[in-house]
Amino acid sequence: MSVFQGEVSSLPPDKSISHRAAIIGSLAEGTTEITNFSGGFDNQSTLSVLRDLGISVRQDEVPAGDGRIVRHVVIESNGLWSFREPSEPLMCNNSGSTMRMMAGILAAQPFRSELVGDASLMKRPMKRVADPLRMMGADISLSDAGTAPVVINGTKDLKTIEYLLPVPSAQVKSLVALAALHADGQSKIIEPIRSRDHTELMLGLETIDRPDGVREIIIDGRKPIAAKPFKVPADPSAACFMIALGLLGERSEIVLRDVCLNPTRVAYIDVLQEAGAGLGIENVRSEGGEPVGDIVVRSCSSLAPLRISDHAVVAGVIDELPMLAVLSAFATGEFELHNATELRTKESDRIEAVVSNLERLGFACEQYPDGFVVKGRPTVNREEAVIECFDDHRIAMSFAIAAEAAGASLRLSDREVAGVSFPNFFALIESLKQ
């Protein structure tokens, strides 16, 4: 077992907040400055699409004052209809967030546009994008399989909408809200199961929490959005990998600084604490409407197997599920997951990806349409095995963490895919080794 110790102030800036800060900046009137913008491939795809739509985007590297160099982004816009017709398809690469949220804006623009991506993104379902926008009067076409390319003939005459989210999805919620900003009147989104709420917070939208647990989000259309600065905290989804590293390591202690602690993003911490993980939260404060703090993680030799099935919990940990599954499998030999069909429509079929790789390492697994069970812990295979990453950053990083902590000799089919969300992933692991 390896030992990992140290303080980390170089976690990637939050991916979700970076996307939204740039997109909201493109809709605002004036100059939007974003400090600590993410350098991940997905967020850079959002900036590239905005540039291709005629938005002024400048990005520089500047000193942060604590020895770090951070990305500073400046966006200039004249408001909701500042976009120009693109001369070619808009390349979103691997970023589903870019494709889905930009579709909401482009549905309201008076021109034709086409959103495309890499081979992985072109297989992901986009009907959930098209359905609410068509209800608002948008002309949208998809492939026969309901996937990209997303071809949009936009209109400035979008109708208001009262939309019940059929699945908990922050991306779908956000694209409906972004489209509704352009509609003449008031729209409402009804959210039975909570998903991350950065869009509502950053736009200052009115929210109503009903006694039955359902949230209503109110959007008043065609109101000017004033430009304002954003400071992006560290990504809690990236923090999950370093937490797993510390929990699996021997005599390890890692402090993760300035992490976003938005309750809709850190449900995985509750899951781990309930299982006996040695996790602490310190120095909690508010920055830009988001709670931020430090996470302290220590080795844990008595972690209970993770069993996740509650719909709300699954929705709250959807991005962290691959890491939680691999962590539980390596630490306890067991894991159980249900009600997570959504995992099959991510960058890869993450249920199949996790199960196939665990089975390759000798774990006994059983797969279901909505989840899987890990039923036995083998002696970790210390001969080199190849992990198939499926072009999915979270699959690559989850198994890399387990290999580092367990001292297993695993080779990733694609190390570079980690750069989608965590460019300094491998360098950071090396810096924590003792």
From Swiss-Prot:
Belongs to the EPSP synthase family. The keyword Transferase applies. The keyword Transcription does not apply. Pathway: Metabolic intermediate biosynthesis; chorismate biosynthesis; chorismate from D-erythrose 4-phosphate and phosphoenolpyruvate: step 6/7. 3-phosphoshikimate binds at K15, S16, R20, S169, Q171, S195, D319, K346. Keywords: Amino-acid biosynthesis, Aromatic amino acid biosynthesis, Cytoplasm, Transferase. InterPro entries: Enolpyruvate_Tfrase_dom, Enolpyruvate_Tfrase_sf, EPSP_synthase, EPSP_synthase_CS, RNA3'P_cycl/enolpyr_Trfase_a/b. GO terms for molecular function: 3-phosphoshikimate 1-carboxyvinyltransferase activity. Its EC number is 2.5.1.19. Pfam families: EPSP_synthase (PF00275). It is found in: Cytoplasm. Its main location: cytoplasm. Phosphoenolpyruvate binds at K15, G96, R124, Q171, R350, R394. This is 3-phosphoshikimate 1-carboxyvinyltransferase. Monomer. It catalyses: 3-phosphoshikimate + phosphoenolpyruvate = 5-O-(1-carboxyvinyl)-3-phosphoshikimate + phosphate. The active site is at D319. GO terms for cellular component: cytoplasm. Catalyzes the transfer of the enolpyruvyl moiety of phosphoenolpyruvate (PEP) to the 5-hydroxyl of shikimate-3-phosphate (S3P) to produce enolpyruvyl shikimate-3-phosphate and inorganic phosphate. GO terms for biological process: amino acid biosynthetic process; aromatic amino acid family biosynthetic process; chorismate biosynthetic process.
